[in-house]
Amino acid sequence: MMASYPEPENASGALLAPETGRAAKEPEAPPPPSPGKGGGGGTGTAPEKPDPAQKPPYSYVALIAMAIRESAEKRLTLSGIYQYIIAKFPFYEKNKKGWQNSIRHNLSLNECFIKVPREGGGERKGNYWTLDPACEDMFEKGNYRRRRRMKRPFRPPPAHFQPGKGLFGAGGAAGGCGVAGAGADGYGYLAPPKYLQSGFLNNSWPLPQPPSPMPYASCQMAAAAAAAAAAAAAAGPGSPGAAAVVKGLAGPAASYGPYSRVQSMALPPGVVNSYNGLGGPPAAPPPPPHPHSHPHAHHLHAAAAPPPAPPHHGAAAPPPGQLSPASPATAAPPAPAPTNAPGLQFACARQPELAMMHCSYWDHDSKTGALHSRLDL
């Protein structure tokens, strides 16, 4: 009996050994977390400490408004806004130059932010920034991700666009090139360029000058011819005054050279008729000009020399060797006139229509000469 007793003990110990080994190894495995303990602890700390590598989902306007609202005095300087954003969101610790420029632009351009100057003048640099009272509720119930659309408050226009002032400055109006209505207190945005002002116009761009008048010599000679015609018509035919007036025109005409306008100008018929003592136009055409242009001695006449007595109708005819006094080309040349005496000096080649005026037989008052009898035929 004693031999059979210890066998079951060994057998039972051998059978229980693996069970005890398994029980010792089971506590090493971590127990499964309970759903009520671990879930709440992990989710509660995540919003308080955001990921530094992730950009916050807020606009720059929301970041500025958040910093101003959470300040003690409801206003902050630019450096105070920077410090709040860096402390609140570590993402902005890097690349400060980029986002800080965006913060400054939003402060200057957005009407929701008002600049408040510091007290005490220029002792400390920087101004305060605060929120406009009309924009306090621009974020619905503190949700900075959604911004409410609001009407912009009315503000007076800036100084450079005030109504009642012209766009042209005082410099443009003073220069003479400004538009009408430009006051002296204008802004000068549309001032004319310098090259259109009066100082430049006088030097480089002169104003067009009026056309030059007629030459003085032409006007003087035309007036003298008209006066001579009027005087000759008033004095009557054959008067010595008319002859003197017409002969006086040769003085200024001779001083202009051989190609003067006066020498190429024909006298009106009234002047010629009053000069030669005839009432009607000449019956015969003037003789042809000479083929040569050198002056002859019979072309010079003295204004004061008395004409010779013409022959009468009852006188005897001249001998065959003597020419008739009616031919002016072969008449005996009179005494030469002095240099200072006025007289007509016309060349035959240049004035064919006035060749008959050189004969001195036309200066008499009687109409019984041989010349008149020939012209009446």
Swiss-Prot record:
It comes from the Eukaryota. Residues 291-301 have a biased composition (Basic residues). SMART domains: FH (SM00339). CDD domains: FH_FOXL2. GO terms for molecular function: cysteine-type endopeptidase regulator activity involved in apoptotic process; DNA binding; DNA-binding transcription factor activity; DNA-binding transcription factor activity, RNA polymerase II-specific; RNA polymerase II cis-regulatory region sequence-specific DNA binding; ubiquitin conjugating enzyme binding. Residues 55-149 bind DNA. Interacts with ESR1. Interacts with UBE2I/UBC9. Interacts with SMAD3. Interacts with DDX20. This is Forkhead box protein L2. The lineage of its organism: Eukaryota, Metazoa, Chordata, Craniata, Vertebrata. The gene is FOXL2.
